Design a protein with these regions (language model features):
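Bacterial N-terminal signal peptides
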Residues: 17-27
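Substrate/cofactor-recognition hotspot
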Residues: 139
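Bacterial N-terminal signal peptides that target proteins for export
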Residues: 4-19
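Intrinsic disorder/low-complexity segments in short proteins, especially the signal peptide
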Residues: 12, 27-31
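Cys-dependent protein tyrosine phosphatase-like superfamily
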Residues: 6, 30-132, 144-197
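Short, surface-exposed ligand- or partner-binding patches at beta-edge/loop junctions that are enriched
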Residues: 135
Length: 197
């Protein structure tokens, strides 16, 4: 708490001390790191960048699409239904008009299916080096698909991939069962040190 004497400017040394503390706590992180303004993609709901060519997020806006295109993304894959309240009207047309590829794989929230993931993986494998944003409404579906794709196809360590997914959410019973099912199909054990399912 700032000393009230500092506010009256009667003890300048303490003022400088408190200003330095505030700068160290708040200003240093803003000036020495990438701020929100440096990367407009970081404003997208639950945006996470896994590599320079693969990221996932929640619902994007039309303004976000311009920034996504400018960042070098060439393909957008959408995993939710287009009739949801927060869906972007005409997202497919907007994306295509910006010169990016658009793929829509509607995944039922309460019943994700193996074929949904297999279709997604097939799309990714057609051109694995194409910069891609995978998104849904809040990055729950997308973060699970990202986790699975990274573990199965990119051979990312389960602990690392799960840690990234846990930043967004800890999958509920339905989605954990889905994860285990897909991993089992690929002969991958979901166990890892420090992994809690």
């Amino acid at each position: 708490m700032v000393n009230t004497m500092c506010l009256n400017l009667t003890i300048p040394k303490k003022c400088f001390y408190w200003l330095f503390i505030l700068w160290a706590l708040f200003g240093f992180s803003i000036t020495n790191g990438e701020s929100f303004d440096d990367n407009p993609l970081s404003r997208i709901n639950n945006y996470i960048e896994y590599s320079s060519i693969f990221s996932s997020s929640g619902q994007v806006s039309s303004d976000d699409l311009n920034n996504i295109m400018k960042s070098g993304v060439k393909r957008i894959i959408y995993l939710a239904y287009s009739d949801q309240d927060r869906s972007l009207l005409n997202e497919d047309r907007l994306v295509k008009n910006l010169g990016m590829q658009y793929i829509h794989i509607p995944v039922e929230w309460s019943n994700p299916e193996t074929d949904d993931f297999l279709l997604f993986a097939a799309v990714m494998q057609q051109n694995p080096s194409m910069p891609t944003l995978l998104h849904c409404q809040v990055n729950f579906r997308a973060s699970v698909f990202s986790f699975l794709y990274r573990v199965i196809y990119l051979e990312v360590d389960i602990k690392k991939a799960k840690s990234d997914m846990d930043i967004i959410w800890r999958p509920n019973e339905t989605w954990t069962k889905f994860i285990f099912q897909i991993l089992e199909m690929n002969n991958i054990n979901p166990a890892c040190d420090e992994c809690t399912w």
